[in-house]
Amino acid sequence: MQSITVALDAMGGDFGPRVTVPAAVQALSHFPELKVILIGDQSLITSQLSQLGTSTSSRLTILHSEKVISNSEKPSLALRNSQNSSMRMAIDLVSDQEADACVSGGNTGALMALSRFILKLLPGIERPALVSALPTISGKRTWMLDLGANVSCDADSLFQFAVMGSALAEEHLCRPPRVAVLNIGAEEIKGNDLVKRCAEMLSQTDAINFVGYIEGNQILHDVADVIVCDGFVGNVCLKASEGTAQLFIEKLKTSMMASTIKGWIARKLFSRLFNELKTLNPDQYNGASLLGLRGIVIKSHGSADVSAIVNALGEAVHEVKRQVPSRISDRLEAVLLERHY
């Protein structure tokens, strides 16, 4: 079995080594081919390992870093001041081919800027995009992009997002994914010039299985496998859907934990529903891919817990196995060749 090495920014996210270190240890038991390099304050990481009753090994190593890029730091400043930071060092390991992928829960803007600067974009890609899987009512997944890397886009960028998202989804689905553009209506006359132009380009591309427009209330209804939008719209939709899921889960949990007769009834009636709703928990879908780069970079939620970071590491393993950047490059080359002729 070929090993897969992932560089984990141990200082990234709201909780740092308190969750990243236990997550790395758990991930090693989940993925036998995985090796993890923990990048961060060595004393803090070692302390967490001691509390877990474990230590470094051939599969778990530490690379000490002096600095952490804060969540409030502007991307331009992060680029200038990133030397010896845990995030920069994680990306450098991918660039130097000492790691196959990196995972960070740190500053999204800084991660995108550093990844683009260090790893460079694939040929034909103008901007990277954040993509993540979302649950649907059928139990399947849908992939949505962009989720915040680009707050404004032109039609060419949206088209490239569709190509990249289609390539990623196909590696999970093993079939041509259905691609839709998020819009305010399903009719062709609806929407602004941006989405209309993107839809026109997609409808003329045989290599993309374009199924038309999709409205916001259909995102989780399994009518498309890939949903394309700009980063502003995508981020708002993502946060709204996560908040709604958490609301239902917390409300139901509160009712079921009540010690009154109402709580007993709720436990009897809704225990199965509660288990179903737990599949909507955003932590189960943690690990947004930064697509369009010459290397694999996975963005974890800043507030991610241990299980969520394990999922992000799992996404990194999957993308390395499936060689996602080269798949995207091949797909883009085929699409551009088709459009040229």
Swiss-Prot record:
Family that this chain belongs to: Belongs to the PlsX family.
GO molecular function, one term: phosphate:acyl-[acyl carrier protein] acyltransferase activity
Protein's name in the database: Phosphate acyltransferase
Location in the cell: Cytoplasm
Protein encoded by which gene: plsX
Pathway, per record: Lipid metabolism; phospholipid metabolism
Highest taxon above the source species: Bacteria
Coiled-coil regions, chain positions: none
